[in-house]
Amino acid sequence: MTGTKNKTRAQAKTEKKPVTQAKAGAEREATGVVRPVAKTRAKAKAKTGSKTDAVAEMKAVSKNKVVAEVKEGALSEPKTLGRAMGDFSSKAGNESTSSTCENEAGIDAWFWAGEEATINSWFWNGEEAGNSSSTKNDKPEIGAQVCAEELEPAAGADCKPRSGAEEEEEENVIGNWFWEGDDTSFDPNPKPVSRIVKPQPLYEINEKNRPKDWSEVTIWPNAPAVTPAVLGFRSQAPSEASPPSYIVLASAEENACSLPGATACRPSRNTRSCSQPIPECRFDSDPCIQTIDEIRRQIRIREVNGIKPFACPCKMECYMDSEEFEKLVNLLKSTTDPLIHKIARIAMGVHNVHPFAQEFINEVGVVTLIESLLSFPSPEMRKKTVITLNPPSGDERQRKIELHVKHMCKETVSFPLNSPGQQSGLKILGQLTTDFVHHYIVANYFSELFHLLSSGNCKTRNLVLKLLLNMSENPTAARDMINMKALAALKLIFNQKEAKANLVSGVAIFINIKEHIRKGSIVVVDHLSYNTLMAIFREVKGIIETM
């Protein structure tokens, strides 16, 4: 042990002189402040991205710091320093044994690990890495740093870029720290922001207690105890004693027998005795349990004391007086219509509906409204009334039709040529001439119709030909069409430019006239007229064959 101590002291003395010179040079450059200069240099090197320069600067700082600390701690821990220096001496001697190789490999790994830790801590924690007055470093670390600084000449020759395994290890360390910090920053099981509202239960209706027909659904005092309310209504108060599936509107005695626990709320308009708040008004909401006698008594109290209509949370306001209420009850005895009974319950304040509905009923008057509904006949009765009306006589109806046909003929010929009004009139006349009864009226306007045929456009000619085709089926009207002017106008339509429909109608008119002559329905007495007629027929036949 004594030899080891002497050897350590000798080595310290030999290295004292260059260390002192390095320290003096560093003090001159930094003007007595070593740590800020070293830190500034290291930061500048880190910004340039050169890792080797940063290591060199840190080594200079470490030398100045370690040499001062070795002097103070050499005496306190000679064993640790001696052991570290002994290891260093054995490795610096370049012995060719297996133990020496193992120690060199360990020192190399420790060297790079220590340098990385020093650089990283200095780079990320600027102030903490450059603080030379820190007392956090342990004594064994001081000895190890001394060994590392003295090993610099030997290790500098073997210093090579770090392998991929070391870089991967560093990335793994940084990655683990990053993701662990990320996991701790977020809640893996976040709570939902919105509150899930569970649906309220629906009360099931007891089918045994339901009325069989609407005759049992009444609200006068001698009626059955219960009447059906809104089916499937979602109750606003699930904890109430009686389910809201039925409404009690019988007398007080029957109400006590059927539902003894049901009592009506009778506070004033400005007070509320019920513990539950008023729900949102709907047109078809939960009915209130109320009897006819209780409603009548409340109306009398209001009339005597001058209290405004009641404002119980479970019912609407009742604006009727005693006389109107008794009339309403008498009207309800005469009908079982569910609509009328529902209107009556709204007027009595039994149904908590939308204020607009009750305001409308109160303004119109519930008695007036129900009386008008009762006096309004059903659709079946109105239909029977229409059917049993005496129809007009045949002569009257025929006279009206004749007046209509004459009016249409005058209007048609008076309209401008090819005007929409004229074409509409021709269309109506074509529908009216399907019956032979009105042909004698239209025959009086043949001259105007043939003028339209010869001077009108294609659509006008088509409507006139349809009308004349209907007239040609009647022998009496066809006889009036056999004259030179009419036949000449009919012959003009047979040309290449005429529409096919018009040609077909013209051919049909000639065929009908020919058939009437052949059958003897039309007799031609004048031979000149007959010869002229036959010449026109032969000419038309030749044109048709040519086309």
Swiss-Prot record:
Stretches for region Disordered: 1-53
InterPro entries found in the cross-reference section: ARM-like, ARM-rpt_dom, ARM-type_fold, GASP1-3
Keywords assigned: Cytoplasm, Nucleus
Keyword Transcription regulation: no
Function: Survival and differentiation promoting protein that plays a role in the regulation of neurosynaptogenesis. Induces phosphatase PP2A activity which results in APP dephosphorylation and inhibits BACE1-mediated processing of APP.
Biased composition, class Basic residues, residue ranges: 1-10, 38-48
A Pfam family hit: Arm_2
Gene3D superfamilies the record matches: Leucine-rich Repeat Variant
Subunit structure: Homodimer.
GO CC list: cytosol; nucleus
Record family assignment: Belongs to the GPRASP family.
UniProt name for this protein: G protein-coupled receptor associated sorting protein 3
Subcellular location(s) per record: Cytoplasm; Nucleus
SUPFAM superfamilies assigned to the protein according to its UniProt record, in alphabetical order: ARM repeat
The organism of origin for this protein: Macaca fascicularis
The encoding gene: GPRASP3
Cysteine disulfide links: none
